[in-house]
A protein has these predicted regions:
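Generic structural signal for well-ordered, non-transmembrane alpha-helical segments
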Residues: 18-22, 45-52, 56, 88-92, ...
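Alpha-helical bundle segments that constitute or directly flank the non-heme di-iron/ferroxidase center
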Residues: 5-34, 80-105
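Conserved alpha-helical segments that form or flank metal/cofactor-binding pockets of metalloenzymes
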Residues: 38-71, 125-135
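Preference for long, well-ordered alpha-helical segments
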Residues: 97-160
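Charged, compositionally biased N-terminal leader segments and the immediate start
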Residues: 1-3
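Carboxylate-rich helix-loop segments that flank metal/cofactor sites and access channels
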Residues: 53-96, 140-160
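Alpha-helical scaffold segments that form or flank carboxylate-/histidine-based iron centers
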Residues: 6-14, 38-53, 79-83, 109-122
Length: 160
């Protein structure tokens, strides 16, 4: 490949992966001290190590993104944005899961319930997105800032 930077579509996929895994890593690290079962603790250790490695590998591509810079800190005042991002990821995953479940549904009453729940998940996603967008926590139309936020979240998660 002779391009000077990553393709836009792969940059956006990197954004999705880094954002999702950064939130996941924080949650894993916050939960770990509360686990009492040794086998589960071992699984959490493996998951934490794997996600840390994933993030380290993925953020190496950020300098090749069409835009974006590094910043190793995440200020306490942006935790609202972090928590909103977690909710946004949950809502997005819910939309995907409901859509898949509907394609597997044969019973009309089950389909109707799932469609209503899908619509609720879509609404939650929209409300959460708009909350974040209005606060400038999700700069959807500014790729450089979007990637900057991803890096800040990843570095924060790795520093815990």
């Amino acid at each position: 490949m002779n391009e000077a930077h990553l393709a836009w579509h792969e940059t956006l996929e990197l954004h999705e992966l880094v954002a999702f895994q950064s939130v996941g890593l924080v949650k894993l690290k916050q939960t770990y001290p509360h686990i009492t079962n040794n086998d589960l603790k071992t699984l959490y250790n493996e998951a934490i190590a794997t996600v840390e490695e994933n993030l380290q590998e993925l953020i190496e591509f950020f300098p090749n993104a069409p835009r974006g810079e590094k910043s190793p800190s995440l200020a306490a005042e942006v935790m609202t944005g972090f928590y909103a991002g977690d909710l946004l990821g949950f809502a997005k995953t819910s939309v995907r899961n409901y859509a898949i479940a509907i394609t597997e549904t044969a019973t009309p009453m089950v389909r109707e319930v799932l469609q209503n729940q899908l619509n609720n998940a879509i609404e939650l996603h929209a409300k959460t997105f708009h909350f974040m967008y209005e606060r400038s926590d999700y700069p959807a139309y500014n790729l450089e800032r979007l990637l900057q936020t991803d890096l800040e979240n990843a570095y924060y998660a790795l520093s815990m």
